[in-house]
Amino acid sequence: MSVKNAMTADFLRSAYGGESMAHMRYLIWGEEAENSNYPNIGRLFKAIAYSEHIHAKNHFNVLKEDLYDSSVVAGAVFGSTNLIDNLQGAINGELHEIKQMYPVYLETARYQEEKEAERTFHYALEAEKIHAKLFQDAQDSAKENKDINIGKVYICPVCGFTTLDENIEQCPICGVKKDKFQAF
């Protein structure tokens, strides 16, 4: 695949960088949560890290025929303090993607008729809405010195859709059957 428009290509690189960093940040914060006796919050971080990996991979694959050196600028929370603050950093990052980043990227791709970029931005935007809610629920529990009470976390391997619903039959974003989902 190749992208014809420089602005959409820049947005794909930026989104790739942001999702890549979120992936690593959530893995680190997940380990810290587990080490602080919050195994379910740790598992939630790791599951959502997998979703962010899928988003980064999707963005990358739209540009994979455009191989050249490029700076990737992506602003994000860096570091780690405590569980509550880490969850707030995750919430803030997800809300930035939902309210600012992906709506602009999606509309630009749509305007520039970049169908593959439009698809990957749509997938990420819809999944991030769920991530923000799950992180908020986790933070609410952590503020009460409790781990979040959740069963398995299911991630769609195509779009990164995230759900706690074990009875879901297929992804509501991309249509993939649940038997393909990764469970955490």
Curated annotation (Swiss-Prot):
Report the superkingdom from the record: Bacteria
**Residues holding Fe(3+) 1:** 19, 52, 97, 128
Q: Tell me where in this chain the Rubredoxin-like domain is found.
A: 151-184
One Pfam entry name: Rubrerythrin
Q: What induces it?
A: Various environmental stress conditions, e.g. oxidative stress (exposure to H(2)O(2)) and other stress factors such as salt, increased pH, high concentration of solvents or cold shock, do not lead to increased transcript levels of this gene. However, PubMed:15336429 shows that rbr2 is slightly up-regulated after exposure to air, but PubMed:19648241 shows it does not respond to the presence of O(2). Is not repressed by PerR.
SUPFAM superfamilies reported in the protein's UniProt record:
Ferritin-like, Rubredoxin-like
Keyword NAD belongs to the record = yes
Residues recorded as binding Fe(3+) 2, renumbered to this chain, are 52, 94, 128, 131
Q: Which UniProt keywords apply?
A: Electron transport, Iron, Metal-binding, NAD, Oxidoreductase, Peroxidase, Transport
Under Enzyme Commission nomenclature, its number is 1.11.1.1
According to its UniProt record, which cofactors does this protein need?
A: Fe(3+)
| InterPro entries hit by this protein | Ferritin-like, Ferritin-like_diiron, Ferritin-like_SF, Rbr2/Nigerythrin, Rr_diiron-bd_dom, Rubredoxin-like_dom, RUBY_RBDX
Give the activity regulation note. Answer: Rubredoxin (Rd) increases the NADH consumption rate by serving as an intermediary electron-transfer shuttle between NROR and Rbr2.
**What's the record's note on cofactor binding?**
Binds 3 Fe(3+) ions per subunit.
Q: Which reaction does it catalyse?
A: H2O2 + NADH + H(+) = NAD(+) + 2 H2O
Q: Output the CDD domains linked to this UniProt entry.
A: rubredoxin_SM, Rubrerythrin
Outline the extent of the Ferritin-like diiron domain.
2-146
The molecular function terms in GO held by this entry are: iron ion binding; NADH peroxidase activity
Where does this protein hold Fe(3+) 3? 156, 159, 171, 174
Lyase: is it a keyword of this entry?
A: no
Say what the protein does: Functions as the terminal component of an NADH peroxidase (NADH:H(2)O(2) oxidoreductase) when using NADH:rubredoxin oxidoreductase (NROR) as the electron transport intermediary from NADH to Rbr2.
Identification of the protein by name: Rubrerythrin-2
